[in-house]
Amino acid sequence: MTAMLDSFATDLTAATSLHQPGNLPHPPHAIDAENVPLSGGTDPTYGEVRWRTLINGTEAAPRDMVLGIAEFGPGHQLRPHRHTPPEFYLGLEGSGIVTIDGVPHEIRAGVALYIPGDAEHGTVAGPEGLRFAYGFASASFEAIEYRFTASA
């Protein structure tokens, strides 16, 4: 699991530093998703999902939030799991079902879902696949402990 989490770290050298007024705790930056390599793939622990973590903190470049894009092929899934921080999803392309604490919710372009902290949730993509943005109020993706139901 640690090796998988290490793959979430994003090299921010491709990020563009934006003007920073002196009163901001962290410098703003912009990054193009196309410049961030995909992580993930197929794994019996987490399913068949790939992701690009676009905004992510490190010791050298701290952040207050994590933002990324998850990508699923047709019928692929992210297995049920939990983590302490709440999370949001915002559908970008395709469709699917996100089951949160046993209740299925449709996700598609323009649909936002709020997932409370420690709520069990998993995703199954529809026949055309699925892309959604995800985010956490966390200093880094690596600080988030994923607890998959099958290995809980």
UniProtKB/Swiss-Prot annotation:
Residues 69-124 form the Cupin type-2 domain. Changing residue 121 to A: Decreased iron binding and enzyme activity toward DMSP. Disruption phenotype: Decreased production of dimethyl sulfide (DMS). Induction: Up-regulated by pre-growth of cells with dimethylsulfoniopropionate (DMSP). Optimum pH is 8.0. Gene3D superfamilies: Jelly Rolls (2.60.120.10). This is Dimethylsulfoniopropionate lyase DddW. It comes from Ruegeria pomeroyi (strain ATCC 700808 / DSM 15171 / DSS-3). The lineage of its organism: Bacteria, Pseudomonadati, Pseudomonadota, Alphaproteobacteria, Rhodobacterales.
